[in-house]
């Protein structure tokens, strides 16, 4: 999996086990600029990123400018995106990673010295 910030896209590659060669299998258009990708045990992907790229650049230059954060859970088969978190940057500016744990989702940022610990429903 490769996140592409400027085109707001996630590329999915198939890997040949014998050679290690990668072949593009699909591109998934997103509504935000994706940063890091976390693979869940069930094959779904948690992707964190930046809904407003120009605001993110302003945040890079001035940390007092809040930058929105977004996290989605992508299911590949069938393809489906579920927004997990969206914030204008008041709780956490410039989300860069979302790590699912049992009963929790940890969301980290590019520059913050803290992360969010969000409780999630337990699925049985």
Report the location of each language-model feature.
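Beta-rich catalytic cores
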Residues: 6, 33, 67, 93-94, ...
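Beta-propeller blade signature
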Residues: 65-78
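Blade-level signature of beta-propeller repeat domains, shared across WD40, Kelch, NHL, RCC1
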Residues: 94-124
């Amino acid at each position: 999996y490769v996140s592409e910030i400027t085109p707001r896209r996630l590329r999915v590659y198939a890997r040949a086990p014998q050679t290690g060669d990668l072949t593009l299998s699909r591109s998934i258009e997103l509504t935000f600029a994706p940063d890091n990708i976390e693979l869940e045990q069930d094959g779904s992907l948690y992707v964190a990123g930046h809904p407003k790229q120009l605001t993110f650049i302003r945040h890079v230059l001035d940390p007092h400018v809040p930058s929105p954060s977004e996290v989605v859970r992508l299911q590949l088969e069938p393809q489906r995106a579920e927004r997990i978190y969206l914030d204008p940057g008041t709780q956490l500016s410039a989300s860069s990673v979302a790590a699912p744990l049992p009963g929790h989702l940890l969301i980290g940022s590019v520059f913050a010295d803290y992360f969010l610990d969000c409780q999630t429903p337990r699925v049985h």
